[in-house]
Structures are given as structure tokens and as C-alpha cells.
Amino acid sequence: MKIAILSRNSKLYSTRRLIEAGRKRGHTVRILDPLRCYMRIAADGFSLHYKGKPITGFDAVIPRIGASVTRYGTAVLRQLEFMGTYTPNPSDAILRARDKLRAHQLLAAQGIDMPVTVFGDNPDDTQDLLSMLGPPPHVVKLNEGAQGAGVILTEKASASRSVVEALRGLYANFIVQEFIGEAEGADLRCFVVGDRVVAAMRRQAAEGDFRSNLHLGGTAVVADATELEREVAVRSARALGLAVAGVDLIRSKRGPLVLEVNSTPGLEGVEGVCGVDVAGAIVQHLEQSVRRSAD
């Protein structure tokens, strides 16, 4: 099988592991920097060039598209899709996942529980908007933030109003959510591949922080995800159209709540903590999917 990986940096851990896993299983693997890809779109067909040469014959593509190049990266991925290349995470699914508001709407429509979320635009409605959410603390999130960036905890109603008004002044898109205190700064990262959770870890925020992201100083241990948590994780990925996803849950009094569905989850943390060959599971999923489409 001929596999392309859309990535701007071949030295990143996740990219290197996917290369290793693909070649170990006997496949040809090539890295394509999405920003060096350019395309021809016409009624008579689609074509893609990379550094002066046509790109053809790929059976599958694994998108590792950074948030800063989402629009161009997904356009390149969409071109490959139109050229008949299989991808576990289609371009439209990545765009759904990276828009937090849209993702939460889609999850809620499937009956998947999450922290109560509000969204509004007019400054005159701020007080009523926050009253729909309930008393503070509140969590304010940039709509397209990543890796814990653009996430603010406000402990008083006045602070919530001030942050909301400041973000509106910057023309930033954001959502506001209820704060789940019983989670105590911990969440569960479930790594979904296909129709199963292949690994799960419990992440704990650093002292004085409420964000559990590892690159912000959080710690992680192997987690024994319950059957319900695994089911919610798989349903969440499926609701957005993703076959490979990192689904972040928190354990609450009313059960597991989905915080986010990440369409480009890093492999270093989960493989290091859980000792699971996640990259190999992704390549195996590609093999099975391409084989099914050929039958």
C-alpha cells in the first residue's frame, strides 16, 4: 500500500511513528508538506502537484494538519479525497472538530452529554447569556483554540462578563461552559481508532491550573476507561465523522462529559504512558479500510 502523511514536519514524534509503523508493515510511506502541494480543479478531473511533480497513486492519506494551516491543509486533503484516496479523517470531519461550537452542536444532537455550553454575539445579551449557563465558575474557550490555549476560568460573574466583553472587543469567536468542579482538574483522553478505544490515559492538571494538557505541565497515567466511557468516546468520534480521534472526557456526577474531540491527536503522550502501539493500530485500520473499499 502507498501511504501519504500530510505533515509540515517529518521530525515530529507522531509523524515519525506513523512512518515507522507503515514501513514496518511493508508499506511505502511519503511525507507531504501540505503547504508545498498545489492543485488543479476542473470538470475533467482533479490533480495535485508537489514540488514540481504530480502526486498520484496513493491508496491512503493520514492527515496531520496543524491548526495554523487548517484551511489550506483541508483543501489539499479534499483534493486527495476527490482523487480517490482513502483517509480516516476526511476534510469535512476535521473542520467540524476544529469548530468547537459546531462540534458541540453535533454531539448534542446525538444525545452525547457535555458541559452545558452557551454562545452569543450581542453585548446587550451578555448578562442573560450567562444566566442561561448558571452561576460561576465558568470556562471561556476560544472557538478554534488548541492544546489548552485560549481557555480561561472565571470564578465570579463580573469576571465572566469582563472576559466575554474583552473577547468581543477583539472580534474573537468563543463559547462559555459550566465548570465541572468534581473533575478536580483531571480528564480522560480516549484514543479512538475505527470502532474502538485502543488506549486511554487519565491526565491531571498541574498544581494551580485546571487545564490537564500535558504540554502545560499536566501529568498522566494509564486509565481503565469504563465500558460507558469507551462507548461515549467512539460515538463522539463517529458523530463528527472521524475514524482516528482523541476524545477528552471528564468524569462527573451525571456521568462522562465530552470536552473535546481532537482530529489530530498527538501520539507521544499516549504511547509513552500506555505502552500501546497506537501508530500501528492506525496503519492497520488503513489496511482494513482500503481492503474493504476494494472488495
Curated annotation (Swiss-Prot):
Domain of life: Bacteria
GO biological process, one term: SOS response
GO terms of molecular function: ATP binding; metal ion binding; ribosomal S6-glutamic acid ligase activity
Cofactor(s) required, per the database record: Mg(2+); Mn(2+)
Family stated for the protein in its record: Belongs to the RimK family.
Residues noted as binding Mg(2+) 1 in the record, renumbered to the chain: 248, 260
InterPro entries xref list: ATP-grasp (IPR011761), ATP-grasp_RimK-type (IPR013651), ATP_grasp_subdomain_1 (IPR013815), RimK (IPR023533), Rimk_N (IPR041107), Rp_bS6_RimK/Lys_biosynth_LsyX (IPR004666)
Protein EC: 6.3.2.-
Residues the record lists as binding ATP: 141, 178-179, 187, 211-213
GO cellular component: cytoplasm
Cofactor note: Binds 2 magnesium or manganese ions per subunit.
Pfam assignment, any one: RimK
Binding site for Mn(2+) 2: 260, 262
Name this polypeptide is given: Probable alpha-L-glutamate ligase
Chain residues that bind Mg(2+) 2: 260, 262
Enzyme class: ligase
Gene3D superfamilies reported for this sequence: 3.40.50.20, ATP-grasp fold, A domain, ATP-grasp fold, B domain
